[in-house]
Structures are given as C-alpha cells and as structure tokens.
C-alpha cells in the first residue's frame, strides 16, 4: 500500500510539473516519447503521444477496460478518435469487458452540445455491446481515465477529441501498478454503482 501511495504522490507531482511546463510553453511543438520515468511503472504521456499509447493499450487488453470521460467526441470521418472508438468495439468483439461512464451536463436547463456528442458516441458503442452509463445532468464528471486489465491506469488532461489527440498541449500519465489500478478501480466501481 505504501508503494501505491508513493506512486500516486509521484504521479501527482509529475502531472503538476508537466502541466506547468506546458502552460508556459504554448508554441506548437511535438514531444518525443518519454525516455525516462519516475519508475518503470510511471510513464509521462504528453500531447499527441497519448493516442498511440492509448490505442496500443486498448488493442492489447485481454480482460477489461473501464473508462470515465468528460468528452468523447463523435466524428463521421476517419480520424484518431474514430480509430479509438473502433478499437473499443474490436476489444469487445475479442471478449474484453468494457464499461464507460460519460458526462452529460445541463446548464440553464439546456442540454449541452458536449452532452449530445457524448450521447451519440455512447449510444453507438452501447449498440455494439459496450456498457455505457451517463452521470446525472446536475453532476459534472470531468475525469479522463481508463483502467486496463486491472493493471494499467491512464489518466490526465486528454479528452477524447481530435484536438486533444493531435494539436493541444495535454499532460497525462500511464501507471503500470496493480495497487494503483485497484485504487482507481474502486473509484470507478463507486461511480458506476451509483449511476
């Protein structure tokens, strides 16, 4: 448990440092894949590197994928978000259990455009056999997190939209640690069971 707490603290500090660095450097730049990490189990994931890492982890999932997202944009044309969406369907067809929690929000009694896109994406995935739930209209779920095979957690600032995958300055982290995955898995279960 001490190791898991250490990893959570280390990741939090790394995210704050990375976010501060990126905020101060807003020029368009591409970061190479990280060649260092706080440990072999904590891997910084910034900017467009997120797509490849997330896509590969989804493609290699064997048992389960649990996802919480603020935004999972809908696109008709083929792009990185469509590839992620289709990789989830492929995983479900391989027998991987997939559950997704998406935000739906209402402001001034109006359903937001973001909520409409999440609903379109969620309904499409549900039609393909993926379990999808939405939070309450009065609650904002701002998470960007996925848990793969109860062993890997990817979390940070990346929404699932084309700009986040290709253009934005974003900072996330991949943690390969069962204790950390269990902690966030419990968090996911609590949200899932209360929707």
Indicate residue ranges for each PLM-predicted region.
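Primarily the HKD phosphodiesterase
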Residues: 61-127
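DNA replication sliding-clamp ring fold and its partner-interaction surfaces
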Residues: 57-64, 184
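Alpha-helical scaffolding within the catalytic cores
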Residues: 49-54, 84-86
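Structural recognition of the beta-strand scaffold that forms the well-ordered cores
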Residues: 65-69, 98-102, 133-134, 146-147, ...
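Ser/Thr/Pro/Gly-rich low-complexity linker/stalk segments immediately outside membranes or between
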Residues: 25-41
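N-terminal Sec-pathway targeting helices
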Residues: 1-15, 20-22
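Solvent-exposed loop/turn segments at secondary-structure junctions
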Residues: 51, 71-75, 104-108, 138-141, ...
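Signature of lipid phosphatidyltransferase scaffolds
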Residues: 144-148, 152-195
């Amino acid at each position: 448990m001490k190791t898991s707490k250490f990893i959570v603290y280390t990741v939090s500090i790394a995210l704050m440092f990375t976010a501060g660095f990126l905020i101060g450097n807003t020029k368009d730049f591409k970061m190479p894949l990280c060649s260092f990490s706080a440990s072999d189990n904590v891997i910084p994931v910034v900017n467009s590197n997120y797509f490849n890492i997330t896509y590969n982890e989804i493609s290699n999932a064997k048992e389960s994928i649990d996802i919480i997202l603020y935004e999972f944009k809908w696109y008709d044309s083929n792009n990185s978000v469509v590839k992620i969406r289709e990789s989830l369907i492929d995983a479900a067809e391989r027998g991987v259990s997939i559950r997704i929690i998406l935000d739906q929000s209402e402001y001034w009694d109006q359903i937001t455009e973001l909520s409409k896109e999440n609903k379109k994406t969620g309904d499409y995935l549900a039609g393909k056999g993926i379990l999808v739930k939405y939070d309450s209209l009065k609650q904002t779920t701002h998470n960007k997190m996925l848990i793969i095979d109860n062993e890997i957690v990817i979390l940070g600032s990346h929404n699932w939209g084309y700009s986040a995958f290709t253009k934005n300055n974003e900072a996330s982290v991949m943690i390969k640690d069962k204790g950390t995955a269990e902690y966030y898995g419990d968090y996911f279960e609590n949200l899932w069971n209360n929707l």
